[in-house]
From Swiss-Prot:
Activated by bis-(3'-5') cyclic diguanylic acid (c-di-GMP). Catalytic subunit of cellulose synthase. It polymerizes uridine 5'-diphosphate glucose to cellulose, which is produced as an extracellular component for mechanical and chemical protection at the onset of the stationary phase, when the cells exhibit multicellular behavior (rdar morphotype). Coexpression of cellulose and thin aggregative fimbriae leads to a hydrophobic network with tightly packed cells embedded in a highly inert matrix. It is an enzyme of class 2 (transferase). It comes from Salmonella typhi. It catalyses: [(1->4)-beta-D-glucosyl](n) + UDP-alpha-D-glucose = [(1->4)-beta-D-glucosyl](n+1) + UDP + H(+). This is Cellulose synthase catalytic subunit [UDP-forming]. The chain crosses the membrane at residues 30-50, 151-171, 173-193, 230-250, 525-545, 547-567, 592-612, 634-654, 668-688, 833-853.
Amino acid sequence: MSALSRWLLIPPVSARLSERYQGYRRHGASPFSAALGCLWTILAWIVFPLEHPRWQRIRDGHKALYPHINAARPRPLDPARYLIQTLWLVMISSTKERHEPRWRSFARLKDVRGRYHQWMDTLPERVRQKTTHLEKEKELGHLSNGARRFILGVIVTFSLILALICITQPFNPLSQFIFLLLLWGVALLVRRMPGRFSALMLIVLSLTVSCRYIWWRYTSTLNWDDPVSLVCGLILLFAETYAWIVLVLGYFQVVWPLNRQPVPLPKEMSQWPTVDIFVPTYNEDLNVVKNTIYASLGIDWPKDKLNIWILDDGGRESFRQFARHVGVHYIARATHEHAKAGNINNALKHAKGEFVAIFDCDHVPTRSFLQMTMGWFLKEKQLAMMQTPHHFFSPDPFERNLGRFRKTPNEGTLFYGLVQDGNDMWDATFFCGSCAVIRRKPLDEIGGIAVETVTEDAHTSLRLHRRGYTSAYMRIPQSAGLATESLSAHIGQRIRWARGMVQIFRLDNPLFGKGLKLAQRLCYLNAMFHFLSGIPRLIFLTAPLAFLLLHAYIIYAPALMIALFVIPHMVHASLTNSKIQGKYRHSFWSEIYETVLAWYIAPPTLVALINPHKGKFNVTAKGGLVEEKYVDWVISRPYIFLVLLNLLGVAAGVWRYYYGPENETLTVIVSLVWVFYNLVILGGAVAVSVESKQVRRAHRVEIAMPGAIAREDGHLFSCTVHDFSDGGLGIKINGQAQVLEGQKVNLLLKRGQQEYVFPTQVVRVTGNEVGLQLMPLTTKQHIDFVQCTFARADTWALWQDSFPEDKPLESLLDILKLGFRGYRHLAEFAPPSVKVIFRSLTALIAWIVSFIPRRPERQAAIQPSDRVMAQAQQ
């Protein structure tokens, strides 16, 4: 390149060109791409007056106008990308110019839209004001209870008849389309309304469409003339029926979350009951358990009414000495039958408190835990159990491996944020094994914690409900713990939960037996059905292959009718769940969670259905490290198998599209769309199986907390603590950071009116951002530090509010990116025999996507882009 340029060009130009070539190479361009980039540059300078100010402005805005083209690393077909993007920008600019004279009509339309949203936002309050007089008049008050029940029965009967007609009435394609348009219009009309009315309306619309779909599937879509099609169709129908049942039960469960608030305790502390705090442990590290004990010691409760117990099923001397040192009780069993349940039951023989609070050994309670929960027990004498959320301050494998910690609600947020709150409405709150308080008298009546299944917590709450006792749930986080560190540990935990819930279904089925209300039976049933999702999910991931590979008609109907029934069913369910679950589970993420678990929970749940006594308890490991980024090939093997199977389906689909019967073309396209969606979801599952590095043993917790640091010379600086861990803190000094790395300073933190001092060393200074490492602390200082940080009453309460509202289309785009990321990981980590397939596939997709035009960046480019493009057109 250098010799050729020197021969053809004058020295200054040759030197500049050689410089450009070397710059391209330094940024990773191949020799051919770098040489071609230089050639395109020469041609551009010959054809276009790039030195003109107008072109200079375009070049200055390159990053904004052409965000997908790296000018420092050219590719052979970059001219085509520039051409496509330029045409796109010109089109945007021209369209805007054409419509500029009509800006007033658009402004009017925007004003109408704003008025509509304002009207919808204020509708519930206006309806309430206009119907207040009806509540006061009590127009039906003169009627007897029997008459009112009769009127209600008539209304319900007519509603059911109308619903039955809507569900079963057959329509031709045009009528079905019009019917769906009407329902969709109503859904769009009410979905922005605040309050519960809009959610109830969306549930009604979704149930109408979904019930109509299931009716159509059972009555019109099975091919009874072809055995293969019939068998495959029935298998898919089984999975769809399961999904429909879970959908209906799920709507019922969360239709009216209770959102229970704390009840104040009596002012006279002598009326407060005695409480035992149990911290069971088996093989966890002492450092994991210490913070829980330190926080328990600081709980705001009379010390003569509080007893803390370490229940050590590992029988370790270090734990015994630690308990003696900090002044808590210690119990170790000689035998270890029934795992955690047996450990707690053994401790119940020694503890004599009126209530027992149970924490897993990594769950750190806040100081307000008992004051927030115990008031309800004094108010309601039949209340047997109060559950609070399981909140985690470390990322679970999904959050860590996908980089979504505190960006997307995690897997457990839906259960603890919405489902348990919905259960509370129906008096069906489950005991979750930790972060809960149980009244001793009812617990003793049922013989202690249930030991017949491996999910002793849910089984215990079921027994309490059968005895006529009530339960409660408070959604305010009052403790926080460690999430599982690896995907394999996470899956192992879910396998235990799934096996245990199915064991309860078989051994103590909530649908039968005495003591439960109908609503409680349905809530328990839905919880157990949730863990049977493995087989249906695998069916959905392979169903389109029945047609593409076996030519079996799993839905025996024209492709147009399939679209008119399937798409509305999915869209309405997605829209309704987005409205109800928006803060707790973003759209399409359930697909990822279920796909990751499906293969692994299917066999144990099937075994538990057949033989409920088979299986054993496994302890979930906490507090581990992941020292290197790697793919868990053992865990990801099933996903890769399903990916290859679906790729085979794509190949078969392409063949059928070109060489199959013409009347099947639309069916082939629908099947391929389904397969591509499955491939995206499976790609997401693969992305989760790539374990990211976790080298911090002490997890950082983000917070905004006032504090101060004191230098040895007496100077004091106010600061804000923005993160902390068990080993150090990150602070921002309010003003100039007048500290040096290696300098020893004292950190001052407040708890209530009390101020505490902790010795630290400066390990990092970046502007006014300072990293502090805790120096060795005394036991008293360590207790104080935990109570000033992890155990603060307000530490966890605002975490849930930090999640953005769900936007289904944005969530779908996130899932698409996630799926592509999974295949990139396969191309990076796969064995040579497989790597070439996925590397070629991801490279092809990335190459195709690189030609798609992008919108210019908003802040930097959209405003000037119109002017620049106009200049370019001149």
